[in-house]
Amino acid sequence: MHTYHKPLDLVRQRPPERPVAIARPDAVATAAHWFQENFKGDVFYAVKANPSPWVIEALPANGVTSFDVASVPEIELVAQFAPGSRMAFMHPVKSRAAIAAAYFDHGVRTFALVTHEVLVNILAATGDAKDLNLI
């Protein structure tokens, strides 16, 4: 792996013929700090924006410990690379199996719902849990 100080350095030294992924941990840190200082609410990172493990791991190190997750694989990713972080299962449609895995296996307590049917599924999958945060 090569290290470049700026993306422009990469292009100048090694013009890419195919797409190139660039990891910029400093940019993640800068953005995390900016949002915490300038946003008055709780900062949640939407895993779907960039599910790279290095991003998920860098966020708690920079103060962001809440994640918007939309699937069990995203939940598992956060559990692995940002253990102890708060997760909100925000996908509008989720199976009872996914809800149960989120709740029982990974401690997710916040679930988004948009219909009565989704509420019924959340309650059924969690055994009518009393510690839910439903939004």
Residue ranges and their predicted role:
Residues 1-111, 116-132:
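A charged N-terminal "starter" segment
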Residues 135:
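Aromatic, loop-rich ligand-recognition surfaces of beta-strand-rich domains
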